[in-house]
Amino acid sequence: EPLDVDRVCLGHRGVWWAEVEVTGRIGHGSMPFLGVNAIRGMADFLALVETELMPRLAERRTRMPCVPDGARQATLNLNSIHGGLAEAVDEGLPAPVVADSCRLVLDRRWLVEEDREAVRAEVIELLDRMKARTAGLDYRVRDLMGFEPTMTEADAPLVATLDHWIHRVLDRPATHI
């Protein structure tokens, strides 16, 4: 384990990176009622994430001996977000349009006690609710990267071998994390 040479990492949380794109209908900025603003749709989704999903994730803890302690819970990080037109560096402000697209990249770390399909489904459920609230909104979810969580039992032969050699070389017992 790179944190300390006397530590044996027994596992890691799973990873699900995904791009969520909310789509609406483009319109002129002076008449936003003729469009469907994807940024507002994403804001609705993010409000559901903050008020409903984040508190649930904070309650989920793994039996794995993770360091630091915060790594023992399921987490969701919002890596990046972009909506509307890009601002033109040399030409001033972007065109006055109702954004028809807003993209978010999320990073969900999940526990060995969780199920891959349930992890994805809880995000989809919030997106479905966002979509149902505003006519003309839709969404796409594109998986970017994913890894299953792993956990090796502390009494596994490989762990016992590492424990033995750490103690022999460093003259101190190994710590399991």
Name what the model sees in each region.
Residues 1-53, 70-72, 170:
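Fold-level recognition of mixed alpha/beta catalytic cores in primary-metabolism enzymes, strongest
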Residues 6-10, 89-96:
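Short beta-strand/turn micro-motifs at beta-sheet edges
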Residues 22, 108-109:
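Hydrophobic beta-strand positions in extracellular immunoglobulin-like domains
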Residues 26-27, 110-115:
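A generic structural motif
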Residues 36, 45, 117-129:
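Short amphipathic alpha-helices in soluble, non-transmembrane regions
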Residues 38, 57-88, 138-177:
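An extended, acidic, His-containing surface patch that forms the Zn2+-binding/catalytic region
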Residues 41-44, 97-99, 107:
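A conserved active-site cap/scaffold subdomain adjacent to cofactor or substrate pockets
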Residues 49-54, 124-134:
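A common structural junction motif
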